[in-house]
Amino acid sequence: PDFTMGENALLEIEKFVPKHSKIAIFYGQKAYDEAKQYTDKILNTENYEILAEQCYGKDANYANVNKILQVKGIQSCDALFAIGGGKCIDTVKCAGNILNIPVYTVPTIASTCAAVTKISIMYDLNGTFLEIVQLKNPPVHCFIEPNIIVRAPIKYLWAGIGDTMAKHIESTFSARNDELNFTSELGIKIGENCYYPILRDAKKALEDAKEYKLSQEVERTIQNIIVTTGCVSLIVNPEYNSALSHALFYGLTVRQHIEKGHLHGEVVSYGTLVQLMMDNQMELLKKTYRLHEEIGLPICLADLELRRNEDLSDILEKTVINQELRHVPYKVTEELILNAIMKLEDYRG
């Protein structure tokens, strides 16, 4: 992916978006309140003609995409800017894809790799997963200002750690038994950096970020969450991008409290433990579980406000039909998943 990261990253915008371009800015409200002091220095100047500057909404759904499509004069824009978290960015990417207008991203949290990928994860109006939209192109450029990200609520970095570790576990699982082409083999190798450096850096990164300290651990973790994960997503065969960690997340969204009360990467990280248990990857499970315990990522159903003895069939039904399980080394059934969930309930690392 094309990206610039650093304390003056936003000053690089002029190198990529010609002066006097017509632009539209769409943002998440809370994110923009923090980011505006940085973005205004470059975007709200005589260099650019701003045709729209508005909140995108609150979720990645087609109602919010349509709001962008209906902005007066939007078709004459030279560039769309998405300033916010993954749902804001996915919404703007989806709109840009329909309009054939280049999208530039300014992530305000390090929670997913949405700022650099060429997919948009769309939900229905109830917040239940709907579909993954394959876009024609990724964002033209991503501008990562670490001072914005380190001042965001710490829960987003925490969830991003969970989402990022899943990439390595899922891609190696999905690609197992296949003869890989060069780019997929390279992408899966890069994916190791979504896991091992995170194991090493995560605890210190969270401690430092709580104090707004831009340590090496914080910067490496931000880069691995946004850029390394995005690299894997962009260059491997799309069928290798996910597996049970994400499929179970999408299944869990049938319970409305999951989308309302839990973050994407937080829930995905639980799915990673379930996948490792199902696949009998006990050494990796032990390492991952230990980090979850250390930093408070979920390790059991109760951490997601679910009970061991409740009926999970609605979740499991939605999980097994998810597209992320179309290309896996063996058939993943409801029974296999439930068995792994119950084993995880009894597991103690």
Whereabouts are the PLM-identified features?
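Solvent-exposed alpha-helices and their adjacent loops that cap or buttress functional pockets
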Residues: 16-17, 73-75, 96, 131-137, ...
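ATP/NTP phosphate-donor binding region
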Residues: 1-79, 301
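A glycine/threonine-rich phosphate-anchoring loop and its flanking beta-alpha core
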Residues: 98-190
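Short glycine/serine/threonine-rich phosphate/pyrophosphate-binding segments
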Residues: 33-36, 87-94, 112-116, 241
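A short, small-residue-rich loop immediately preceding and capping a beta-strand
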Residues: 72-110
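Active-site segments that bind and position negatively charged phosphate/pyrophosphate groups
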Residues: 180-291
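C-terminal charged capping/lid subdomain of soluble metabolic enzymes
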Residues: 281-349
